[in-house]
Protein backbone atom coordinates (compact mmCIF):
# COMPACT_ATOMS: atom_id res chain seq x y z
CA UNK A 1 0.00 0.00 0.00
CA UNK A 2 2.80 2.35 0.87
CA UNK A 3 4.42 1.84 -2.52
CA UNK A 4 1.34 2.78 -4.53
CA UNK A 5 0.66 5.76 -2.29
CA UNK A 6 4.16 7.04 -2.92
CA UNK A 7 3.67 6.68 -6.66
CA UNK A 8 0.40 8.61 -6.53
CA UNK A 9 2.03 11.40 -4.58
CA UNK A 10 4.91 11.53 -7.04
CA UNK A 11 2.50 11.77 -9.95
CA UNK A 12 0.52 14.57 -8.31
CA UNK A 13 3.73 16.40 -7.50
CA UNK A 14 4.90 16.19 -11.10
CA UNK A 15 1.56 17.47 -12.33
CA UNK A 16 1.55 20.52 -10.06
CA UNK A 17 5.17 21.27 -10.95
CA UNK A 18 4.28 21.35 -14.64
CA UNK A 19 1.29 23.58 -13.93
CA UNK A 20 3.22 26.09 -11.87
CA UNK A 21 5.93 26.20 -14.53
CA UNK A 22 3.55 27.06 -17.34
CA UNK A 23 1.13 29.29 -15.43
CA UNK A 24 2.99 31.06 -12.67
CA UNK A 25 6.42 31.46 -14.21
CA UNK A 26 8.09 34.82 -13.82
CA UNK A 27 10.18 37.08 -16.00
CA UNK A 28 13.67 38.46 -15.32
CA UNK A 29 14.02 40.49 -12.13
CA UNK A 30 11.01 38.87 -10.48
CA UNK A 31 11.42 37.34 -7.05
CA UNK A 32 11.68 33.57 -7.12
CA UNK A 33 12.31 30.47 -5.08
CA UNK A 34 15.19 28.38 -6.38
CA UNK A 35 13.58 25.04 -5.53
CA UNK A 36 10.27 26.00 -7.14
CA UNK A 37 11.79 26.75 -10.58
CA UNK A 38 9.23 29.48 -11.10
CA UNK A 39 11.21 31.60 -13.58
CA UNK A 40 10.43 31.40 -17.30
CA UNK A 41 13.65 30.50 -19.10
CA UNK A 42 15.70 32.20 -16.38
CA UNK A 43 17.60 30.85 -13.45
CA UNK A 44 16.95 31.96 -9.90
CA UNK A 45 19.86 33.91 -8.44
CA UNK A 46 19.82 35.62 -5.06
CA UNK A 47 16.04 35.36 -4.96
CA UNK A 48 15.55 36.98 -8.37
CA UNK A 49 15.10 35.63 -11.88
CA UNK A 50 18.08 36.47 -14.04
From Swiss-Prot:
* Disulfide partners: 25-40, 32-44, 39-49
Organism whose genome encodes this protein: Conus bullatus (Bubble cone)
Q: Name one GO cellular component term.
A: extracellular region
List, alphabetically, the SUPFAM superfamilies matched. omega toxin-like (SSF57059)
Coiled-coil annotation reads: none
**Which residues are assigned to the propeptide feature?**
2-24
Q: Which family does it belong to?
A: Belongs to the conotoxin O1 superfamily.
Q: Keyword Hydrolase, does the record have it?
A: no
Provide a Gene Ontology MF annotation, just one: ion channel regulator activity
Give the primary localization class: secreted
Q: Keywords on this record?
A: Disulfide bond, Ion channel impairing toxin, Knottin, Neurotoxin, Secreted, Signal, Toxin
Signal peptide feature range = 1
Subcellular locations according to the entry:
Secreted
Which tissues is this chain's protein expressed in?
Expressed by the venom duct.
Protein name, UniProt field: Conotoxin Bu13
**What domain comment accompanies this record?**
The presence of a 'disulfide through disulfide knot' structurally defines this protein as a knottin. The cysteine framework is VI/VII (C-C-CC-C-C).
Amino acid sequence: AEDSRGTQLHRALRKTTKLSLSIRCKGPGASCIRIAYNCCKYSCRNGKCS
